[in-house]
Curated annotation (Swiss-Prot):
Localization terms from the record: Plastid, Chloroplast
Gene: ABCI7
Gene Ontology cellular-component terms listed: chloroplast; chloroplast stroma; plastid
Protein name: Protein ABCI7, chloroplastic
Keywords: Chloroplast, Plastid, Transit peptide
Native species: Arabidopsis thaliana
Transit peptide per record: 1-36
Amino acid sequence: MAAATVLGRLSLIPNLSSKPKLKSNRRTTSTSVSVRAQASFSDPFVLQLAESLEDSLSASPSSSLPLQRIRDSSAETLLSTPWPSRKDEPFRFTDTSLIRSSQIEPISTQQRNSEILDNLTETQFTNAVIIDGFVSNLTIGPSDLPDGVYFGKYSGLPDELTNRISEFIGNFDSGDLFWSINGMGAPDLMVIYVPEGCKVENPIYLRYFSGETGDRESKRLPVSNPRVFVLVEEGGEIGIVEEFVGKDEEGFYWTNPVLEVVVQKNAKLKHSYLQKESMASAHIKWTFVRQEAESEYELVEVSTGGKLGRHNVHVQQLGPDTLTELTTFHMCVNEQTLDLHSKIILDHPRGASRQLHKCIVAHSSGQAVFDGNVRVNRFAQQTNAGQLTRSLLLKPRATVNIKPNLQIIADDVKCSHGAAISDLEEDQLFYFQARGIDLETARRALISSFGSEVIEKFPNREIRDQARNHVKGLL
């Protein structure tokens, strides 16, 4: 039989106080990894990886101060963090041995991959092609972006924006070990900036490719660390699309991206995320979002790739009347693990969050993982937070592990969560067959419709069609 685990916790803690905290900027002096390791705990494997990351950037041109600040703080965190195991609660159901047992090689130089660039599908949107963490192609038409909008490398920022962007770089709460690996290994920083009151009509399209692949027999695993920062000033609006694709369907590589987002007062960001990595790869992504008062952040995600795929989403509401919406769909069609770990922190009155997560496991050795945390702190009165996860297990021994966690400290709230796990309904299949439709066609139609609820939430038709066709091709 298919296996399913649901671990739920609803906690009411009326006497605890939790006020929003601002993290202060800290400047550090760059020192070698080996020197820093003497004064802190270090897992030997992590230390070796940290040294490889440092060596990979040693030949690069001198970095900007904010990027160097990220590298220094990430090195400190990395050297005090052991490699995660199944004994660690955040990785209880997620096995990272695919990476741990490999010979990891950070990609240190930018290679112009003509095969990828020559075979790009056309898009109407302003876009960047990022290969192995390096920006390889940037396409911006003369009238594509309104005045004041910036899209490009940090090193190309105009002087009047440099100080503004630098206020936020390296000033996010720390993530886990993989976040620190990105911080040490990111070769550059991509920046998207939207000025006050500016509404960008068309989305900005970030297309990530893995051009360098390793060898499963020798266990050589190239790793890339793309990093993007987005700042939407007060009253601004924009959409961004992230698409991750492997050069080879069976490519053996590891993509380890980080996206950091600041949405200022009354600003809006629509975030579309399409993960189509190779079935032999590892993909571990962090998305950090900070929302100010009256702002809106919406994520729509479809993930199907990677032998190991994980998305860590951390959203913090830093003002009242704030809306967060996460709509995600994971589909396992091979021997793979797809994992969503989300955390939404509501700290102010009249905040709202809506979360829908769907997953399909269509392989007997496939596994889906969902760990969804929503924390409603004491000052977040009149909050409305809802969370729902639905899963389809289509093969014997297919597995899903669900852990909804709703923590409520405020006492004037409207909050709910639910989970449902099943196979396809027999009466639905019978309905199709009674109308002359064969069983296999009926199953494919029902499976496709299960994910379409999420796919239809993509705000742009081009992305909807691409996601729909991709999912159909996997069925």
